[in-house]
Amino acid sequence: MKRSIVTGGGNNDKKFKAQPPPKNNYRGGGDDEEDDEFEEDDDEDEGDEFGEEEDEDDIDVENIIASDSMDIDIQDDGSQQLFLWSRKPVQDLVPHKKPLIFQQLEVDYTEIKEPVPGMPGPKVGPLPAIRLFGVTKEGNSVLCKVHGFLPYFFISCPPGFTEADCKSLKHDLNESMKMSSNQSNEKDIENIVVSIDIEKKKSIMGYNPNPLSDFIRITLILPKFVTRCREIFESGRHHFTIPGQPFRQYQTYESNILFALRFLIDKGITGCSWIELPANTYKLSETPVSTCQIEVDTSLETIISLSDDDSPAPYRILSFDIECAGRKGVFPEPEKDPVIQISNIVKNNGDAEPFIKNIFTLKGCSSIVGAHVIPHKREEDLLREWRKFVIKVDPDVIIGYNIVNFDIPYLISRARQLKIPEFALLGRIKTTISKIKSTRFSSSNLGTRESKEISMPGRTQFDLMQAIQRDHKLTSYSLNNVSAHFLKEQKEDVHFSIISDLQNGTDDDRRRLAVYCIKDAVLPMRLLDKLMILINYTEMARVTGVPLSYLLGRGEGIKVLSQLYRKAMVENFLIPTYKVTGKGEKFQGAIVIEPTPGFYDTPIATLDFTSLYPSIMMAHNLCYSTLLSAEEAKKLPPEIYTTTPFGDHFIKSDTKKGLLPRILEELLSARKKAKDELKNEKDPFKRAVLDGRQLALKISANSVYGFTGARVGKLPCLEISRSVTSFGREMLDKTKKIVEERYTIANGYKHDAVIIYGDTDSVMVKFGVKTVAEAMEMGRDAAKFVTTTFIRPINLDFEKVYYPYLLMAKKKYAGLYWTKPDIHDRMDVKGLEMVRRDTCLLVRNVVSTILKKILIEKDLKSAEEYTKSVISDLLQNRLDLSMLVITKALSKTQYKGKVIHNELARKMRARDPATAPNLGDRVPYVVIQGSKGAPIYEKAEDPLYALEHNILLDCQYYLDKQLKAPLIRIFKPIMSNPDLIFHGEHTRTIAQSTLSDNNKGFFGTLKKKKVCMNCPKELTDTESTTCINCQHKEASLYQTSLEKVTSLETKFSEAWTQCQRCSGSLHQPVLCSNRDCPIFYMRTKVQLDLIEAKKTLNRFNVEW
């Protein structure tokens, strides 16, 4: 059941009252860090909680575990199923003889009450322990607890402060920390501040030719104390002073980095890397706290990070989906509506097929080929058994579609309502319940989205909906539309309003629901494989060094910050902690050389700068550590620094190479290596890994510039970002000047070259030659020559030729794309409506067809005639509703004015809050006819509502506001007067609505009066079909009506059969309401047309 709607959480029943967890057991998954330590990306914001969250101290975990039977109640081939579910047993693990090697997938930390004997660190608790969850090559699950790592941060060392002052500072800071605490148990901790040390470092901000200077390192006992201690220094909290120093505020360094990420950076471990624990450096946990097969304790000092070139481990992936039985007209709510089915698909990473496909059902269900049906009599049993199934299968990664915002929260809230406390123990830590909190994520690329964050230690939740929203721009993100787009297949969508009827029906009815539910678990797994999503994200985690779970829940900044911290640590640089304000000076973006619009029937060569922004940063050594102020620059010889076109100053690389340029060099060098290996690799799986790696490296390199320019980022630097774009503008102008001055008739060439357009990193050159081969030759020569005028590694590359080329405006063009002189690769379109998401399908299809006729067929007359026929069909309501649906993202809750999709969302919320669009969703709508002068936002309507209520669309709006502008843009460079396309015989017949008793009029014209079927004459009471003057044509009219009914019946039968095939049965009625499927609207339209056609045919009073 895939819905983008998220309903409220659980009840307020404080059923579980708690005892503390058993001694030496671990109690949580890093949820004790203070809030702002989790705000790793500045575009995150925490919202209200989902339902009610219980702390672990509110749950009697001890009693739950004691009463939690893991006996699984399944029928028929139960022993075989249990064997399939279980992992392979561990073989020959002898800690003092053999190393333990595993791939870590999830990293977090917990607090332990007492230290583990033999492990480093303080000898009195509480203490933090890093937890690495992973899988061995044999497929065994691992929990490795790393001891001895403590949180720390730095402050600048005041003058006169020495090693002798460290002890008194530690004492005073401990006292201040205890005074500021409102927790009694914190006051009992002897040393919140574990140590004060002086280290030689330097700040990354600004060029500093001097040697390293003193900084104070403050080490604390637990991560949750970092924020409070930082505030003491930054804000002068409690007027704290360093002994012997006047009262002042201090700049802190590296005080807002997540504790688990700090560990990975300090140990040189990347996300999803392989870990080795050498023999005799680890021991099996005496009191296991997890459900992992292997649980060990080890020291911080002995853990080893291995090369990340090895193949991924065979980790287990669970894809699941749930179905709920809602009440009539109400979207399911966990407080009231039962979970009736849960489907599951399980496979090992790297395998082609799943080894588990089953479905847990409430009540009986007919058998399903290829799936194991596990029925239950009570909902409580279904939920308990499914949770046991999850624990038994022990998945490393849980996937699905919208599971984070719907399925998992619904299951947890429903179990709470049914008083099943053990259900929330879904993670791998036996005493840690899964908690849910609401978050709000914002970024310039992705907009604002509300989401949930679910703690499930040891299991990575990977919501395919979130991944696809991040990586692909689609008109709709429903599972139906995504599957149609990527897998080229539609799926049946059973509306939630009829699910209860199916559930209350027969075993066969529930089987139909089960087939639908299973498909919603199968499709995410297929999308995962098709798009190589997990492979690509795993490689991104390795490249950037962050845990896999950070990549979906956080923005781009965390990835760059991780790389910057790693490089800074090696160089003894410190990264300052700044308050995020979201304010700052804006700067001019990239230049666009003004286009010369036209239809070019000669080849246009395109020259592209390779990795433009990274290349500029490397060429000019742009970095935090090389930045000079104007005053500092005046004191230095001008030959050792660069002055950017914007007037900023940076030290040149031969004096001091910056960290950012070195990071970029390593990323691009590694990408080149991955691409070279990809060319020679034959194994499909290894090819996918290498391709994912080179893509991750490319994205990471391109993200560095954006990181410096993010005004709400962790380390914004306007001087870097504006310098990059100013160099880019200068380079485009220089390229234009060189090409137009060199390739001229005066210099011996056949034509004068002209730059007809330039945008950010590309220039389009008209050399005047007649063939693609000639344009390619001159393009290569020009790229090579211009490159010699720039500083390395800036490189201008010839990439392609457009021929023919239709240039309409800035960022709006189309052409045939050639990389070989003999045949074009494809039709390439930029900025036009066929690639935009805020236009209806009609516009995209029409623009695409017209461009094919102009560019490929080179038949302008055919393009004109086709356009006129579409306009005629539109004005006469002969088009499917699916062609006229528009979608826009709901990115804000409040807009300055009345915005069409926001107003529709309000209207839908008033009708049914449960099914209304949420923040971040794309809102589909159609424009209906309204009163004269009505604003457009009043005429927006939900397509399904319009369909069900037979509301006539405003076809004139679609012509004037959707079709006309893009068509004028296309035809203007080709025709002398493109407006003529919108006038003429084909525009004279326009469908009008005359309301009948039942308010019909959605797809056709309805008449008030009974008139002759051949002429406009009104009929008498004795006439039913034709007037007396047209009676001789009655037979012909009858034949036409009969043929129309027959044709519509055939169309309806074909649509009905197609829908039946999609549902998996040719013997059951069609229930699908997939609004992303054009067949759904076509079937309904044909059905309505057929009703009207039969009414017309019945006027002939023919006896059958």
Swiss-Prot record:
Reactions catalysed, as given in the entry: DNA(n) + a 2'-deoxyribonucleoside 5'-triphosphate = DNA(n+1) + diphosphate
Superkingdom in the source lineage: Eukaryota
Residue ranges, annotated region (Disordered): 1-60
InterPro entries reported for this sequence: DNA-dir_DNA_pol_B, DNA-dir_DNA_pol_B_CS, DNA-dir_DNA_pol_B_exonuc, DNA-dir_DNA_pol_B_multi_dom, DNA/RNA_pol_sf, DNA_pol_B_thumb, DNA_pol_palm_dom_sf, DNA_pol_type-B
PROSITE patterns attached to this UniProt entry: DNA_POLYMERASE_B (PS00116)
Zn finger spans (CysA-type): 1012-1030
Main location: nucleus
Signal peptide location: none
Needed co-factor(s): [4Fe-4S] cluster
Keyword Nucleus among record annotations: yes
EC annotation from Swiss-Prot or TrEMBL: 2.7.7.7
UniProt binding sites for [4Fe-4S] cluster: 1059, 1062, 1072, 1077
Cofactor note as given: Binds 1 [4Fe-4S] cluster.
Residue positions of motif CysB motif: 1059-1077
Annotated source species: Dictyostelium discoideum
Domain notes per entry: The CysB motif binds 1 4Fe-4S cluster and is required for the formation of polymerase complexes.
Described function: Possesses two enzymatic activities: DNA synthesis (polymerase) and an exonucleolytic activity that degrades single stranded DNA in the 3'- to 5'-direction.
Start-end of Acidic residues biased regions: 31-60
GO CC annotation terms, alphabetical: delta DNA polymerase complex
Disulfide bonds: none
Record localization: Nucleus
Sorted UniProt keywords: 4Fe-4S, DNA replication, DNA-binding, DNA-directed DNA polymerase, Exonuclease, Hydrolase, Iron, Iron-sulfur, Metal-binding, Nuclease, Nucleotidyltransferase, Nucleus, Transferase, Zinc, Zinc-finger
GO molecular function: 3'-5'-DNA exonuclease activity; 4 iron, 4 sulfur cluster binding; DNA binding; DNA-directed DNA polymerase activity; nucleotide binding; zinc ion binding
Name of this protein: DNA polymerase delta catalytic subunit
Residues at which Zn(2+) binds: 1012, 1015, 1027, 1030
Subunit structure of this chain's protein: Heterotetramer composed of subunits of 125 kDa, 50 kDa, 66 kDa and 12 kDa. The 125 kDa subunit contains the polymerase active site and most likely the active site for the 3'-5' exonuclease activity.
